[in-house]
UniProtKB/Swiss-Prot annotation:
It comes from Hyphomonas neptunium (strain ATCC 15444). Pathway: Cofactor biosynthesis; (R)-pantothenate biosynthesis; (R)-pantoate from 3-methyl-2-oxobutanoate: step 1/2. One of its GO terms (cellular component) is cytoplasm. This is 3-methyl-2-oxobutanoate hydroxymethyltransferase. Its main location: cytoplasm. The gene is panB. CDD domains: KPHMT-like. Its EC number is 2.1.2.11. Homodecamer; pentamer of dimers. Binds 1 Mg(2+) ion per subunit. HAMAP family: PanB (MF_00156). Catalyzes the reversible reaction in which hydroxymethyl group from 5,10-methylenetetrahydrofolate is transferred onto alpha-ketoisovalerate to form ketopantoate. Mg(2+) binds at residues 49, 88, 120. The active site is at 187 (proton acceptor).
Amino acid sequence: MSKQTQTTRKTVKDIAAAKGATPLVMLTAYDAPTAAILDPHCDILLVGDSLGMVVHGLPSTVGVTMEMMILHGQAVMRGASQAMVVVDMPFGSYETNADQAFLNAVRIMKETGCQAIKIESGAYAAGQIAHLVERGIPVMGHIGLRPQAINVDGGFRAKGRTEDERDRVIAEARAAADAGAFCIVIEGVAEDLAAAITAEVSCPTIGIGASAACDGQVLVTQDMLGLFDWTPKFVRRYADLREVVDKAAAEYAADVRARRFPGTAETYSLRKQGS
């Protein structure tokens, strides 16, 4: 009988235990090499539908498909062995009813091997969350600014700035938590609202543009690394890889055109007979 060894990954219980403790670290990952680099530093790797904009150049996340999420989820699972891997359910894959949500969530988990899925959880999605959790699928909620809803909201803008919006965001948080979400992403809200939600719900909250009042933080990795020429207000750049890549590409192009590359060190030579 053969032995199988398995690296211990972060679990739902590990994430739940972080409530009010050391903040959770989450970053996005869309490919195996990046996942391997981020894996030792993160509690959670999110295969976000942001990949539509970040990797595929789409104008929003609305055009992202199940096939895209599964392909990138598989790649991240090959690169990561310690962090929990969560895959976004794309727009149109869960809204119709709980059965649709279950079938698509099962497909994502079976075909990628991920540990959980994420749903942009307006209050209407509470039924879907409960349905999935009852059937063994861990769900991360997502409230506040919901990128999949930009066509209703009129673009990417912060939420909870009016009393009505504030009440709606709090209701979304309560609904997701009561339905069994093991964690909730709070995006694009003011600090006092993020603090109020974090204090009210029993599950951990992870903020993106929602202040340090949350139980953890997430950023799009490419934003954090400075790969784009525009930086959102809530992002802190920890590198300027756009400049690094631009400089490297320029030097490579110059060397090729001047026939400095490849040089002797990068060129194969015929072996002498007997050597």
